[in-house]
Amino acid sequence: AKTVPGDYIVKLSVNDTELTQDFTIHKDPTSEGSIEDIKAQFEFVNEINSVVDEAHNAIENIRKIKKDLTKFQSDYADDESAKNLINESKLILESIDLIENELYQTKNQSNQDPLNYGVRLTNNLGNLNSAFRGGDFGPTAQDIMVKNELIKKVNIQLEKYNSIISEDIPGFNSNFKNLELDYLNVFM
């Protein structure tokens, strides 16, 4: 989205020196969109970007957790005392895998795969955002309705993710500590 026309201040800080400069962004005189349209577009795109960023951060964390839990399962597969904890880790893995797959298409390997597997929530939001790359018009009522529905669905997944992060992972870590297992396993 384009920056909304108006008056701005740019600030440059280097070490202890700070310089500021006022400047104005003018509306393109050939644009048919109003400043209100440009502002609505800017806010629309930024809201989507914010939600997609949050979802992508969750996906990155999910992938790290999956890697760590998979390693844990491998390291303690033969340890009878860790059997219940391994089962707990499998449940967490299953839950976060479902969340990741709702947020992002994980099966894409080729250009054909989005057709085979479909796009997911963050992809849909990104596609909606790309509709605003040209022009200075604000979102339509239908655009806003679709955005709100997609954001609602993303937020449901993020709530599930946050619940796992705030409840299941600390519970797993507590159980891990109670078993007094070695954190690092070195095999020679």
Regions found by a protein language model. Give the residues of each.
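Mature extracytoplasmic or organellar-lumen-exposed domains after removal of signal/transit peptides
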Residues: 7, 14, 21-23, 27, ...
